[in-house]
Swiss-Prot record:
One Pfam family in the UniProt entry: BP74_N
Keyword field: Coiled coil, Repeat, Signal
Organism in which the protein naturally occurs: Dictyostelium discoideum
InterPro entries: BP74_N, cAMP-inducible_BP74-like
Gene: cigA
Record-given protein name: Cyclic AMP-inducible protein BP74
Record's note on what induces expression: By cAMP.
Region (26 X tandem repeats): 149-757
Span of the signal peptide: 1-24
Domain of life: Eukaryota
Coiled coil listed as a keyword: yes
Residue ranges the record marks as coiled coil: 754-787
Amino acid sequence: MNKFYSLPLIIILIISCGAFFIHGEEAYFEYRIHNEKFIFKLSDDIKIQHARRVLSGDEISLTNVVGKIINKPIEYNINWDFHLDPDSVTFFESETEFCNQKFQYVNGYIDKLCESDNCYFCPWDGSLVRELYFGDIKQDLLLRNNENQQVKQVYEGDIKQDLIRRKNKIHPEKQMHEEDIKQQVFFRIKNIHEKPVYEGDIKQDLLRRKNKNNPEKQVYEGDIKQDLLRRKYYDKSQSTQVYQGDVIQDILRSINRQEKEIYEGDIKQDLLRRNNQNNQEKQVYESDIKQDILRRKYYEKSQSTQVYQGDMTQDILRSLNRQEKGVYEGDIKQDLLRRKYYDKSQSNQVYQGDVIQDILRSINRDKKPVYEGDIKQDLLLRNNQNPQEKSIYEGDIKQDILRRKNLDKSQSIQFYPGDIIQDILRVLNREEKEVYDGDIKQDLLSRKNLAKYQSTEVYPGDVIQDVLRVLNHDEKEVYEVDIKQDLLRRNNKNPQEKPVYEGDIKQDILRRNNLDKSQPKQVYPGDTIQDILRIINRDEKVYEGDIKQDLSGRKNHQEKTVYEGDIKQDLLRRKNLDKPDSKQVYPGDVIQDILRVINRDEKEVYEGDIKQDLLHRNNKNRQEKPVYEGDIKQDLLRRNNKNHQEEQVYQGDIIQDILRVLNHEEKEVYEGDIKQNLLRRKNHDHPEKEIYEGDIKQDLLRRNNKNHQEKLVYEGDIKQDLLRRNNKNHKEEQVYQGDIIQDILRVLNHGEKEVNEDEIEKDLMQRKNHHQEEEASEDLEEEIGKLWNKQSQAFVEQHPNQHNNQKTIHLSRQ
């Protein structure tokens, strides 16, 4: 206690006089006791200068820190539950043990040690280490221990961040050290010609540059969506500033090169403005979005190019003085690019809706290309000299409609978009009809030369889809993208209008014109996500299932090729059934894709990665086939047949796709993208075959055999598929499948009955004894858990006060 009263008078005097110091800038310093780091703030100019003299070695006497404890954490000292009052902090020389202790100990017993408001802390066995610099946003200290760091390292945490300020001019190397906090710090190297990049309030990427003597600049990215790359060779370039909005972005620029390159990261964006000597300042108008507009210099003779941005995220990169107009896009939400050389074109404005999109147009070129990015969309209206203005009607969606000029003699083509995300690209005055689509939800293409056709309207439903129509060509092509769908209705001259009935689903029904008085083909979609493409007046029939895919129809189909996209399934059936025996495919509850090329010597079936499809064929002389379902979700399909009775399908609430072609010898295909579809066929000469389901997702298919007994199917709790073949002279053939993904390929019209499975494991049926082993294992784990809890409770009861036997300290109080 004698030492307590011998606390140096200088401490008391300095503390009591702290209120008279003049406040100016704020500074942050790190104080260490061994490996424990503590950060305190100074707001008095005299104290700040004193601390800096301690760091530089000019002050060697008053080097220890004392300050009043405030029992709550603060953002710049996030590692501890207390901090020092900035106004009370000062420096002293002598050593006293009463208020000296490690930070960790004080942090653990702060409530007992500081019961009053006048609790001081004077850790004399520590040392002042360095000064830290902060920005104006939420952040914390980022510091790492590096003694001889030639490489400047930046370590980021998990939050939005700000710019850290440079250390004083005395220290050319700026070291940054990080705590385990939510923060990122960006710092800059002094003696490099590299142009600075200022980051805003965003999630970023850490850039680490090699030492200044290394000509090659390396970029190290962190774990965020962004990369800031700085390019060298800025020797003669003008000052390049980066103005940031409230965005996420990376802008990389090479300025004094003939080729104007833009390097983007994988991020949202930033606003960049360049000064150009011979041009007016390029303005950037932002709406409610996060974006970036980059304007390139050398606009010497170009007209004023304004970019009006809507509610989107984009990056605009422009190369203006090149013959080839190049656009470099990254992996970002988009950019509106307008090209110069608008010498004779009218004013081209961009009207944006509530979308995210990129529209790039080259206007006075022979070829009218449209480049789209990976985005949702924007509304663009172009002025057309001769036709009337094309109006655009939007639904509840984000979309883009692009209309091309020079519609000299074509009729007005209206697009009514619904609740979709799409991009419509039209190239009208070209002999070759080109469509460029990106990685978007869809693309609606209407071709010109509708001189002899009625008005073609597009009615979209509550779907996402892509409908491409080529009307004045012999080949009826339908190109689909990887999307959900839309309802399309076409007017047919002679037949009545084909109605479309939708369920609760997102779908697309495409109807083609029937030129030759064919009967109307009706499609009743259920609760599915599907795309039905019908080419009616063509020899080739194309049937798709409930998939994400792309069907491309070829013109002079000697060889029947099928182009699949990135889909879950594609069912293709080819015509030319010279020997029209019934081709049946019975898939189970598998993930598959069935493609059929029928008029080839080799019958190939390619399957993909989908759930299943039940296919039942109609037999002329059979009665109606009922369908019994269990716990599944299904759909209703009804088709009218002239020469047959009505085929009813009783479905539940499932997701499926049913495609039917009625007036052909080929039997229909019923597929679903569903947990299951149970289809039962009746044979008038045999009793009805029943279907038994388990708790699984499956499909049981039973075939009637005249000379054999019924083939039984036993399922476990797995996903499986039972395939049964009719063999008159053979015994019953059973297939037991396990929890696999399989493919069943059947070629029926050959002498040899083959069943080929692709990439599956066969006969993985978990048997009864395996279930018993699992149940025994669960019982054993339950007993072990009960024993552990009992022992833990006994230990706690024997040691109730173990955590209270700690030492406390006495802190001096003023």
